[in-house]
Regions:
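N-terminal membrane-entry
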Residues: 216-235
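Intracellular coupling helices
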Residues: 239-267
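Membrane-proximal juxtamembrane linkers immediately C-terminal to transmembrane helices
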Residues: 1-9, 29-30, 72, 130-132, ...
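Acyl-group handling in specialized metabolite and lipid biosynthesis
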Residues: 9-12, 219
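Mid-to-C-terminal secondary-structure elements
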Residues: 59-75, 88-220
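Short amphipathic beta-strand/extended segments in non-transmembrane regions
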Residues: 6-7, 17-75
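Glycine-rich loop motifs involved in handling phospho/adenylate chemistry
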Residues: 79-83
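Generic structural signal for small/hydrophobic residues in well-ordered secondary structure
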Residues: 8, 24, 34, 66, ...
């Protein structure tokens, strides 16, 4: 699905209100499914299991998360992992920390004394992704227990959710950005009051080194990476030149030694 996933943001940032992806899903038949994801509200939550208490980073997502993203599932039914609003998927490393060698499936965890979730799956730790590594992945509905402005029907908080869309094969929304802007102008307060002006549809492949900033996803500095690459290439070139010079010098030295031996009558 990598080449069919996009995120919808604006000229300043990639985040949006939670309802945005659902609005677009209703409006555009090009969209196969949507998945709002929140990462910045789940940092350093207290997780309780029996007499254990650990600090964990949570990601809140729609039940469609594993239908969009291909993170490896180590235990559990991929198609039903987040089916229940109180389900949770734990990372392999966190499962080992909190459950040891016990089977995590069906175990109940408390989050910051406010709610309980049941483990339905174990996933491989997230690496090399725009989505930060999470100890727990829980349903997006659970975030409202800490922040009411992030409900599925409340567009008030425009700065914590990334609206991921999975487009149908062969479909493209980039040509519809003007239409999306007009729609947002009617329905979305940050456009209506001109806090932002431009809607952007950003392919997943362009997020890491893209021009649209995000405080909740992993991003890289393309310019810095190019500088490092250039430095690496220069070091390699100098190393090759030094090797060639050293080889030539050693060959010359051996030629002199052989000439000297011949003059002295050595064979």
């Amino acid at each position: 699905n990598y080449d069919r996933i996009v995120a919808v943001g604006n000229e300043d940032f990639l985040e949006s209100a939670v309802p945005v992806s659902y609005w677009l899903e209703e409006r555009y038949p090009e969209i196969e499914k949507v998945c709002p994801v929140i990462t910045d509200q789940g940092k350093s939550k207290q997780i309780f299991y029996g007499d254990k208490k650990l600090t964990a980073d949570l990601v809140y997502a729609d039940s469609t998360f594993f239908g969009l993203f291909s993170f490896k599932i180590l235990d559990g039914d991929r198609d039903r992992l987040l089916e229940d609003p109180y389900s949770a998927v734990v990372s392999e490393s966190f499962a080992r920390k909190i459950f040891g060698n016990d089977d995590p499936i069906g175990k109940s965890l408390r989050i910051s004394d406010s709610t309980s979730v049941m483990v339905t799956g174990v996933m491989e730790d997230i690496n090399r992704s725009v989505i930060p590594n999470a100890d727990l992945l829980v349903r997006i509905e659970r975030v409202t227990e800490f922040n009411q402005s992030l409900s599925k029907t409340n567009p008030g908080n425009a700065g914590s959710c990334v609206s991921f869309l999975l487009l149908k094969p062969g479909m493209d929304l980039k040509g519809r950005t003007d239409e999306i802007q007009s729609f947002f102008k009617e329905r979305y307060w940050i456009y209506r009051y001109d806090f932002v002006k431009e809607a952007r549809v950003v392919p997943l492949s362009d997020i890491y080194f893209g021009n649209t900033a995000s405080h909740s996803l992993n991003q890289g500095d393309k310019r810095f990476s190019l500088v490092l690459m250039s430095v690496g290439i220069l070091i390699l070139i100098f190393a090759i030149i030094n090797y060639i010079n050293l080889t030539v010098a050693q060959a010359g030295q051996r030629a002199k030694e052989m000439a000297t031996r011949r003059l002295l009558g050595s064979s």
